[in-house]
Amino acid sequence: MLYELRVYDLVYDNRFGMHDKFENYTVPIFKKHGFRVLGFWETMIGANYPQLTYILQWKDLAERQQKFTAFFSDPEWLEACRIMDPKGPFIEKIHSSIMFPTKYSPMQ
């Protein structure tokens, strides 16, 4: 298994719009395409506040590529972007790391 850590540095004045987009559009479309989301977190204290962090689980890189390709071409996602994006940018920067567990990790 592989794990993807995704951290979004959010635009402060538009951070609630990002949460709305995830709750109402992103998460349902993730479910539709079989994304395995291990959790979502919002930074409470930290140098890059506000941030949205989440972890995805993948069998391999091919699965990641296939599911993200389907996600980004999904008509529901394209409509969500059309509706939400004119409200202004939500994200300043995206950090993404693909990780695999160490042999001593409980996440095997």
Predicted feature residues:
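Short hydrophobic/aromatic beta-strand micro-patches
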Residues: 9, 55-57
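Active-site acidic-Proline motif in GNAT/NAT acetyltransferases
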Residues: 12
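An amphipathic, aromatic/His-enriched active-site/gating alpha helix that lines ligand/cofactor pockets
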Residues: 16-38, 59-97
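The conserved glycine-aromatic submotif of the RRM
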Residues: 47-53
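Intrinsic disorder/low-complexity detector
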Residues: 1-5, 9, 41, 46-47, ...
